[in-house]
Regions:
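Boundary/linker segments flanking structured domains
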Residues: 1-63, 67-154
Length: 154
């Protein structure tokens, strides 16, 4: 059971930062869906576990937040999705590989396009600050990272 244990931190002052986000239109697919129709455009994405059943209330656990492309990168949402499909088979990022395999069959991939010229890195930092996903380690605002390290969360 201990391998499934993850610490989730929800801080009201961080959650309030949602009001600072630009307007994002989120799309959702089950992770590992064969050949999904994903955009060749920069954006942000998140992996979550959603336990869907008619007898359960809506729920979601954000596990990881990332970016595809940035003001100086041509990476796309479609390319990043394919990277994660490969990562599930070949371990180049141990923590992410573990997440993808531990929760295989239960992961949802959420993505939102971000206009060219807008920093996906800034949006990623805002999202990691709001959710503090347990599989993110480096993509936090400096002051948030320091607080998390001080609390022995990172």
């Amino acid at each position: 059971m201990s391998k499934y244990r993850r610490e989730f931190v929800l801080c009201p002052s961080f959650i309030r930062k949602k009001d600072e986000l630009p307007d994002l239109v989120w799309n959702t697919i089950k992770f590992n869906e064969p050949s999904p129709n994903l955009p060749d455009h920069q954006g942000v994405y998140a992996f979550s576990i959603n336990v869907e059943h008619g007898s359960l209330p809506s729920n979601s656990y954000i596990l990881y937040v990332g970016k595809a492309g940035d003001t100086t990168s041509n990476n796309t949402i479609k390319k990043r999705y394919r990277d994660y499909i490969r990562e599930a088979r070949v371990q180049s990022r141990p923590k992410i590989h573990r997440m993808l395999n531990l929760w295989a069959g239960h992961l949802t991939y959420h993505y939102a396009e971000v206009p060219n010229g807008v920093s996906t890195g800034d949006i990623e930092e805002q999202l990691t600050t709001i959710f503090i996903p347990p599989y993110n380690t480096n993509d936090f605002l400096v002051e948030v990272r320091d607080l998390l390290k001080g609390a022995s969360i990172l």
